[in-house]
Amino acid sequence: MKIGNALLAASLLMCLGQEAIADNTYILATGRRDPRMYAIDLKEALKPQNNNTPNAIVSRSKTALDRLDGKLLGDPANIVISEDGKTAYVVNHHGAIDNDEFQQHGGRGNIAVMDVRKMTQRRSDNTAEALEFHIDSGHFGAVGLVLLRDMFVIGNAESHLTEDGGNRITFVDRKTGSLRGAVELALGKPGFACPDFPVPFVSPHGPPSPVPLLSPNAAWGCFPDSNGITVGTASDGKHYLFTANGGTNDVSVIDLAAALAGSKTAEIARIPTQIGPWGIATSANGRWVVAANRESQQIAFEGNTISIIDVNLAAARSPAAEVARVLVGTSDSNVQTRPFIPSFTPDGKFIVVPNFRANNVSIVDLSMALAHQPGAEVARVPLTRPADADGVVRPARPKGSAVTADGRFAVISGGPRTTFAASGTVWIIDLRTGTVAATVTGVGNDPYGLAVVDRGD
């Protein structure tokens, strides 16, 4: 662990929750290549005898019905919990696919609507009992998800059967699944001519041979390929969508009211970032947005910073809306750390950042970052994994993050994609000490997003 100084460590300790761990608190982690949702009992995970074991896993819920030949289907990459905590909305990035067969990008995304109580019951293990129904995402490569009262707002990162070509933010009715509209984001300015706008759909049998399928590719840069999506609130009460545009190395600002009125010009600004961002999050008060600058889709280069955006300045279309850029995962600006999916603590004072390439997690003090003080990364927590089934110890490769409601623990998902079933990992970090309190093994394969729920029995 790296701590800036004793005063900062004390500040971190004072700001975070001190309450006892509640019963019926669960981590819900996406299994990704293992297309199930993993429910982990937090209290059980923290028991010393369960460390570095899968013992705290309560159930593994299917995110799609099995194929007729018995193959598991689905591609869970993100999860958002309903306002009442009873329903989980799981984003199947490429829909109900067989991960062993579907080896490229650009599948039709869907949302699996799942019952949280059933997901956290042992009798649901390896069943589809918690799955209620699917909702089509309205486009391809769904990743980001925001809940409005009546609608889903979905970030679709790709086009049909290719990782590039994503420029649609779709609005889908939560009750019926009807596609109500879409915002088509402007194309980027990569320095060469871009295709006609809007993006045409390619043949349902696959893209023509000249179309590149996977990044990095020097011909990309036209399409935003939006990954994460979040909502910020300006001081006047107006709401804005922010999308992390991995393809154009920036963040889009969308006037939510205009988008809901069907405006074709709801995107009001673009905020340049270090490199293509992936994860994005908003502080509890809605004032600050953080984007993790992951990697370029044009060249083999990974980022090492987070961008902090002032919602008021973004709403005003100010070119100075990125008010801070913080180096994470390293003290050397030449080292690529690949930050992934950030989270705010509930009080909005700290940002948790998993750094995929650096195999660590950064804790960033927001006030220090905004003041441009050195040492805003007040803690850096190294992560390790036990050996896989073949005896090889592989890197941690953290991706997803979430924070418990009391602010005491950060939960991190990770592990490289392997040929072994259930080879992923979840780490539980005690934010009072900046150390790993527990490690849960056997959580999916290449897990991405995760959430913490209090079942409230």
Cite the ranges covered by each PLM segment.
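Bacterial N-terminal signal peptides that target proteins for export
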Residues: 1-7
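Bacterial N-terminal signal peptides
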Residues: 9-15
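Predominantly soluble domains enriched in secretory-pathway, periplasmic, or organellar proteins
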Residues: 19-457
